[in-house]
Design a protein with these regions (language model features):
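Preference for long, amphipathic alpha-helical scaffolds in soluble/luminal domains
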Residues: 1-273
Length: 273
């Protein structure tokens, strides 16, 4: 099934970000539009990577310069999408994630984050938060082909323990990440196949009912495309296309501060498809 995209979608998105985004958001959009290189992007990415290899301060969800898992996986995503010729930032990011993995296989935010009044999805010690952070890291490392750098088997086993037969605790994040993770394993078990299919079916049902923020729907369409989960993609992608607003940017219910990121992710998906 083919899905129509307006011819000017990328140009309108780029113009929106030139008016409303930071320099980083603008160059990421230019990369998505095919007019900036990964090396151009890296110039603007570098200030967000800390000395320990972790990343901070991308999305405005909290103050401070602490390296967090939720920001580091986003930095990993930008490096994955833009592929700068200097791989040192990527290597440092992967090493930070290797050091940050807990013995039981999961990732969690550091306790120090509590000093900065983080949002609920960044509170350490919460099982559902650990699941989505672990799934986020695994998803991007698998896509990069760098999963051997961490204890992937332990991380996957931790995720399996969160599956109750029909869903993971928490929101949609762990579910859409799990679609890609459990479809990408070289030797999946029957449980892994059930998890991948169960997550896809759940997301299809929720999207069909209008459940899901625009930013998350873009991520869902992305992993569906990358994993070859066509039925999920056929539901999610038309919603993504329809979420472009009159001003050229993509909508999100999280907050206007997240619209530039939402716009970049939608542009990248459209270019890739």
């Amino acid at each position: 099934m083919e899905h129509a995209v307006p011819d000017d979608a990328l140009a309108r998105g780029l113009e929106y970000l030139r008016r409303n985004g930071t320099e980083l958001m603008g160059v990421l959009a230019a990369h998505s539009a095919g007019i900036a290189s990964g090396d151009d992007v890296l110039v603007h990415l570098r200030p967000y990577q800390n000395d320990d290899g972790g990343w901070e301060r991308f999305d405005g969800d909290m103050e401070g310069s602490l390296s967090t898992i939720s920001q580091t996986w986003l930095g990993l995503q930008w490096l994955l999408w833009t592929r700068p010729s200097d791989t040192t930032p990527l290597d440092r990011t992967v090493e930070f994630l290797r050091r940050s993995q807990h013995d039981d296989g999961y990732w969690d935010e550091p306790e120090e984050i509590l000093k900065y009044d983080p949002p609920p999805w960044m509170i350490p010690g919460d099982f559902s938060n650990r699941l989505w952070l672990t799934s986020a890291v695994c998803c991007k490392l698998l896509e990069l082909g760098r999963e051997a750098a961490v204890g992937l088997d332990a991380a996957i086993e931790y995720l399996r323990k969160g599956w109750d037969g029909s869903r993971f605790p928490g929101g949609q994040h762990t579910h859409w990440m799990a679609v890609y993770i459990f479809a990408s394993l070289s030797e999946p078990t029957d449980l892994d196949r059930r998890i991948a299919r169960g997550c896809a079916s759940r997301l299809i049902d929720e999207l069909s009912k209008g459940i899901g923020d625009a930013l998350d729907v873009t991520s869902i369409a992305y992993v569906a495309f990358r994993s070859g989960t066509r039925d999920l993609f056929d539901v999610a992608f038309p919603i993504v296309v329809g979420n472009q607003a009159e001003d050229g940017g993509w909508t999100t219910g999280y907050d206007d501060i997240h619209r530039p990121q939402c716009t970049i992710e939608a542009m990248h998906l459209i270019k890739m498809v």
